[in-house]
Amino acid sequence: MSGRIVQIIGAVIDVEFPRDAVPKVYDALKVSDTETILEVQQQLGDGVVRAIAMGTTEGLKRGLDVVNSGSAISVPVGKATLGRIMNVLGEPIDEAGEIGEDERMPIHRKAPSYAEQAASNELLETGIKVIDLVCPFAKGGKVGLFGGAGVGKTVNMMELIRNIATEHSGYSVFAGVGERTREGNDFYHEMQESNVLDKVSLVYGQMNEPPGNRLRVALTGLTIAEKFRDDGRDVLLFVDNIYRYTLAGTEVSALLGRMPSAVGYQPTLAEEMGVLQERITSTKTGSITSVQAVYVPADDLTDPSPATTFSHLDATVVLARSIAELGIYPAIDPLDSTSRQLDPLTVGEEHYNTARGVQGVLQRYKELKDIIAILGMDELSDEDKLTVSRARKIQRFLSQPFFVAEVFTGAPGKYVSLKETIRGFQGILDGEYDDLPEQAFYMVGTIDEAVEKANNMK
C-alpha cells in the first residue's frame, strides 16, 4: 500500500496513507524511485505517520510516493555475513558483491524470556594482564570500557577481538555506532592483517550518517549476533560506541518533538538502553558476550548516559587519563575497574587474594603520594618505602605491548595467560623481585621477561 510525503524536516518525514492502511510503528517504508528507507516512529492521526530516514534525505520532496513494506527492517544473518561490512539495512558496503544470505531477520525482536535465559560463571581469558587479574570477564557477560576522548577504548577493543578470535577461535560481531570512518577502515585492515576477518561480521553506521541510522545500527549488529547464538554458538558482540547510540536517540527524540530531560537527553533514555541491553543475553542454546566502549563526556562518570549504562554491566573497565599520562598502556585503572566475577567462589582463592593484594598496595601508594609530594620519600617508614617500591613495579607491570599497536610501538604484542599473570603479581607482592629496577617491569609480558630485561639492563 502506498502513501505520499507531506512534510520533510531534516531526517524526519511525515507520510500520509489511506486511513484503512496506516503502517504500524517500526514498519519500514521505501520512498519510490530512491534507495531511501524510512522507519515509522509515530502515528499522528488522520492517516499521517512520522518516520525517521535511515539514509540521506537529499533530493526528497513533498508528494513523492512511499511504499509500506508491511514489516520491520530486516537484515542478512548467518555465516554469509562473516568477513563482510554492512550498513544498518544489511547492505554490503565493502564493494565485494552481494552478501548471498540464506536468511534475513527483523531488527526489532523481544528479549529472551526468563525460562530461556542461562547464567554462566565461566571465565573468558583475554590475555590482557590487568583485565584478567582485576576485572575478569564472564562468558556470556556484559563488559563496558569507560573512558574519555583518546584514552584507548577502541585500541583495547581491537586487541580483545584479535586475542579472542586468535586464541578462542570464536565468531565476533562488531557494530560501529557513530564512530570515525577512519577507525572503521583501520579496524577492517587490522582484522585482515591478523587473519581473523573471516570470523568477524562488521556493521557500520559512522559519524556522518543521519541519526536514524546510528540509532538502529546497534540493533542490526545485535540481530546478527542473536542468530549465531540461536544456532548454538558462543559469540562476541562488540559495540563501539554505546554513547553514540544514546546520542542518536537524543537527536531523534528532539526531531520528533519530545521534551528533553536531564542534560538534554531524551526522556526515554533508560527504556531505549534497556531495549538494547536486555536482548544482549545468553540462552540455553548459546551465549553472547558483549564488550561495549562507553565514551564518557568530559570524563564525568555521573553523566546520565554512562550512568544508565553502568546498571546493565557485569564488569566495568575504566580507562583513566591520569594513567595514560604516565605512559602506561592499556591505561586501565585497577582501583576503579570492577567485575562481578572477582569473587573467591568464581575465580578461586589464589586469584582473588592476588587481585585484592595488588589493589591494596596501589591504594596505599595513592594515599602516600601526598606525603611524598610534600616531604619527599626520605620521610617515609621503611615499610612504606617498600610498599611504594612494589606499587611502582606493579603499576609498570600492569602495562603490556598490544598486537594491534605493534605499528605504533614497534614492540611485538604479548598474550599472557591467567596463570602467568597471577604468578607474576604474586611474586611482586611476596617481594621476590624487590631487587629488580622498576623500569624492567615496563611493557613486558610475563614476569620472566621482566627478569630477562633487568639482566640486560645491567
Curated annotation (Swiss-Prot):
Statement: the UniProt record of this protein carries the keyword Protein biosynthesis: no
Subcellular location: Cell inner membrane
Enzyme Commission (EC) number: 7.1.2.2
CDD domains on file: ATP-synt_F1_beta_C (cd18110), ATP-synt_F1_beta_N (cd18115), F1-ATPase_beta_CD (cd01133)
Record membrane topology: Peripheral membrane protein
Superkingdom, natural source: Bacteria
Disulfide feature: none
Keywords, alphabetical: ATP synthesis, ATP-binding, Cell inner membrane, Cell membrane, CF(1), Hydrogen ion transport, Ion transport, Membrane, Nucleotide-binding, Translocase, Transport
InterPro entries associated with the record: AAA+_ATPase (IPR003593), ATP-synt_VA_C (IPR055190), ATP_synth_F1_bsu (IPR005722), ATPase_a/bsu_AS (IPR020003), ATPase_alpha/beta_chains (IPR050053), ATPase_F1/V1/A1_a/bsu_N (IPR004100), ATPase_F1/V1/A1_a/bsu_N_sf (IPR036121), ATPase_F1/V1/A1_a/bsu_nucl-bd (IPR000194)
Catalytic activity: ATP + H2O + 4 H(+)(in) = ADP + phosphate + 5 H(+)(out)
Claim: Coiled coil is one of the keywords in the record: no
A cellular component term, taken from the record's GO annotations: plasma membrane
Family annotation (PANTHER family): ATP SYNTHASE, ATP SYNTHASE SUBUNIT BETA, MITOCHONDRIAL
The protein's assembly and partners: F-type ATPases have 2 components, CF(1) - the catalytic core - and CF(0) - the membrane proton channel. CF(1) has five subunits: alpha(3), beta(3), gamma(1), delta(1), epsilon(1). CF(0) has three main subunits: a(1), b(2) and c(9-12). The alpha and beta chains form an alternating ring which encloses part of the gamma chain. CF(1) is attached to CF(0) by a central stalk formed by the gamma and epsilon chains, while a peripheral stalk is formed by the delta and b chains.
Protein task: Produces ATP from ADP in the presence of a proton gradient across the membrane. The catalytic sites are hosted primarily by the beta subunits.
Family: Belongs to the ATPase alpha/beta chains family.
Name recorded for this polypeptide: ATP synthase subunit beta
Species per Swiss-Prot/TrEMBL record: Chromohalobacter salexigens (strain ATCC BAA-138 / DSM 3043 / CIP 106854 / NCIMB 13768 / 1H11)
